[in-house]
Amino acid sequence: MKIRIDIPHHPYDIQIEKGCMAQAGQWLRELWQPQKVVIVTDNHVASLYAEKVKLSLEDAGFQVAVFDFLEGEERKNLTTVQKVYEFLVKQGLTRSDGIVALGGGVVGDLAGFVASTYMRGIHFVQIPTSLTAQVDSSIGGKTGVNTPFAKNMVGTFAQPDGVLIDPLVLETLGKRELIEGMGEVIKYGLIEDPELWALLTGLNGSVESILEHAETLIEHSCQVKRKMVVEDELDNGIRLYLNFGHTIGHAIEATAGYGKVMHGEAVAMGMVQISKVAEEKGLMPAGITQSITEMCQKFGLPVDYENWKVDKLYQALTHDKKARGNTLKLVLVPELGSATIHPVSLEEMKDYLVK
């Protein structure tokens, strides 16, 4: 299946197909002329797929080198970026060459940032290997790295030339790594896609059920992401809906220490906490918090952060990228399948941190 991201200045396709990673070279040859390519990946993904993708690209006529770094959210920083820059220079990459981001969200965000800044921008593509990356972070052009202050605080908007999604690679994920991706999938059902929510309701929450329906879950999620990105590429309007649960979720990730709480886990906890307070304030319908909580728990996602410290979470919120002055754009769900922006002051956000 192909999903077109029809952005006027940089349209591209998401290709979703079981087993398609084996044809990565043929796919890339349709996008780029043979040239130098650097695969950016982490050490874990490299051990599984780097050689397979490298050989496929070489068979298609590309000159290929591989750069891998230690896996983990804590490596998504400017220190790693500098190391990639140095590798690209040693390989002699020019503006006519490109980067293949092969990995999960950390790899995709970092490699995209490198591509968008090296020599003021070179071409790149995404081959996401985690569920979170396949349904969310590989699509839409947000790149970035973390700082000690906030997640993705340094970044760019830079669209890839294509996204290649192979649902079969999810079978090599650990249980926790697969389940955390369901945080984003559940979010899509809540903010835009009642049909997806109904599908999730019908699943029993097991790893087997996720893998069996992975292609459908990915397609639904990508369609929602496509709509938001095409209408609002630079995150000034409808695309903000994608941040449901992320305001508190990012604060949890930052205060826990990057890599301690996985992104989808933090999003799940953020959705539940925001919904609980918003429901109490009459801003979200009665019973929706229970529905979200039960859905997250069914798939094994955490719904409560055990190291909850209001002062530290609040400090992290002050660095939120969606803040405008002293106002945050909080995303709420007034009814299943729709979202809205509710501006709140930083002071009022303290209410949303009360357990």
Curated annotation (Swiss-Prot):
Pathway annotation from the record: Metabolic intermediate biosynthesis; chorismate biosynthesis; chorismate from D-erythrose 4-phosphate and phosphoenolpyruvate: step 2/7
Cofactors required: Co(2+); Zn(2+); NAD(+)
Annotated cofactor note: Binds 1 divalent metal cation per subunit. Can use either Co(2+) or Zn(2+).
Major subcellular location class: cytoplasm
GO biological process terms, semicolon-separated: amino acid biosynthetic process; aromatic amino acid family biosynthetic process; chorismate biosynthetic process
Subcellular location: Cytoplasm
Top-level enzyme category: lyase
One cellular component (GO) term of this entry: cytoplasm
EC code: 4.2.3.4
Catalytic reaction equation(s): 7-phospho-2-dehydro-3-deoxy-D-arabino-heptonate = 3-dehydroquinate + phosphate
GO molecular function: 3-dehydroquinate synthase activity; metal ion binding; nucleotide binding
DNA-binding is among the record's keywords: no
Keyword terms of this UniProt record: Amino-acid biosynthesis, Aromatic amino acid biosynthesis, Cobalt, Cytoplasm, Lyase, Metal-binding, NAD, Nucleotide-binding, Zinc
Role: Catalyzes the conversion of 3-deoxy-D-arabino-heptulosonate 7-phosphate (DAHP) to dehydroquinate (DHQ).
Entries under NCBIfam families matching the protein: aroB
Protein family: Belongs to the sugar phosphate cyclases superfamily. Dehydroquinate synthase family.
UniProt xrefs under PANTHER family: 3-DEHYDROQUINATE SYNTHASE (PTHR43622), 3-DEHYDROQUINATE SYNTHASE, CHLOROPLASTIC (PTHR43622:SF7)
UniProt-recorded name of the protein: 3-dehydroquinate synthase
Species per Swiss-Prot/TrEMBL record: Streptococcus pneumoniae (strain Hungary19A-6)
Gene name tied to this protein: aroB
